[in-house]
């Protein structure tokens, strides 16, 4: 036990021989630094370097008058008001532009509407006032031998108006084709009358008078249909004319090409003559019926 204590004393014996250390310097080190700083400042203030300063002479400044201040303030106020006015004017211009565009569109629409109303009013007035007075049945019947388009031009009316007026007058179909067909039939009978001579002159004359009478009745009553005998006579005349034309063309071909008669492609003169005779006989029979009807009517 005693040995152990002696060893501990020996181990800490170096502390007794260590130099003395002043602990007062560690107690408040900040205060010492402040004192050093103050001393340095005093020394630097006492040993200040002289600086050379140069001063320029400044002009005497006069205070601004109220007029100048008012002018500056009014100018700035005017600028702000002008900017506001420019913005307002641009907005007004835009509004005016849109208003002008809308007014233009309205004017254009009104013009179109007025034009269409004027056209409709003209048509209605023309149809209601002028059509019944001028387009009578007698006036319209003068143009039956024209196609309906040419008749409308000659009457200086529209095609639709003319058709409407015809329906009002009881004319369902324009009788141009019917009357022209009768004229063709009358001309065919006249040609046959020249060819026959005095043999069947009386019968042909009776047929012509019957056809002229039927034409006048159709002029008065345009919706009247042809009689059966007139239809058959028209068909017979058409066949006879067709066969005559065929015979003429056959003769012209045979005169140009003599060898053509031997071929079977071209009909012979006898067959054409037989067909022509049949059609002529049919025409004569129908003409006899016309003459008998004419005499019985008398």
UniProtKB/Swiss-Prot annotation:
Q: Identify the stretch(es) annotated as Disordered.
A: 1-22, 73-112, 241-279
A Gene Ontology biological process noted in the UniProt record is: regulation of DNA-templated transcription
Cellular compartment(s): Nucleus
The record ties this protein, via Pfam families, to: RWP-RK
GO MF terms here are:
DNA binding; DNA-binding transcription factor activity
Keywords, sorted A to Z: Coiled coil, DNA-binding, Nucleus, Transcription, Transcription regulation
Domain (RWP-RK): residue spans on this chain: 121-203
For this record, an example GO cellular component is: nucleus
State if Hydrolase is listed as a keyword: no
Coiled-coil positions are 188-222
| Protein's name according to its UniProt entry | Protein RKD2
From which source organism is this entry? Arabidopsis thaliana (Mouse-ear cress)
Q: What is the lineage of its organism?
A: Eukaryota, Viridiplantae, Streptophyta, Embryophyta, Tracheophyta
């Amino acid at each position: 036990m005693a040995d152990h204590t002696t060893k501990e004393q020996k181990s800490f014996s170096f502390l007794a021989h260590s130099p003395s250390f002043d602990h007062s310097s560690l107690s408040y080190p900040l205060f010492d630094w402040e004192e050093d700083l103050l001393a340095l400042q005093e020394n630097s203030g006492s040993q200040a370097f002289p600086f050379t300063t140069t001063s320029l002479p400044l002009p005497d400044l006069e205070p601004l008058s109220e007029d100048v201040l008012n002018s500056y303030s009014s100018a700035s106020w005017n600028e702000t008001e002008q900017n506001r006015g420019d913005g307002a004017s641009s907005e007004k211009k835009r509004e005016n532009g849109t208003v002008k565009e809308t007014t233009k569109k309205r004017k254009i629409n009104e013009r179109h509407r007025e034009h269409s109303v004027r056209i409709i009013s003209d048509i209605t007035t023309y149809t209601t006032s002028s059509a019944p007075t001028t387009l009578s049945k007698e006036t319209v019947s003068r143009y039956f031998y024209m196609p309906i388009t040419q008749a409308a031009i000659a009457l200086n009316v529209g095609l639709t108006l003319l058709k409407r007026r015809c329906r009002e007058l009881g004319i369902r179909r324009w009788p141009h084709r019917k009357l022209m067909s009768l004229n063709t039939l009358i001309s065919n009978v006249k040609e046959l009358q020249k060819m026959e001579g005095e043999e069947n002159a009386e019968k042909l004359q009776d047929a012509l008078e019957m056809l002229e009478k039927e034409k006048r009745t159709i002029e008065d009553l345009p919706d009247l249909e042809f009689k059966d005998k007139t239809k058959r006579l028209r068909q017979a005349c058409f066949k006879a004319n067709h066969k005559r034309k065929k015979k003429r063309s056959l003769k012209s071909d045979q005169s140009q090409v003599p060898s053509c008669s031997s071929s079977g492609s071209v009909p012979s003169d006898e067959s054409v003559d037989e067909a022509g005779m049949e059609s002529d006989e049919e025409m004569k029979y129908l003409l006899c019926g016309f003459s008998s009807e004419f005499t019985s009517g008398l």
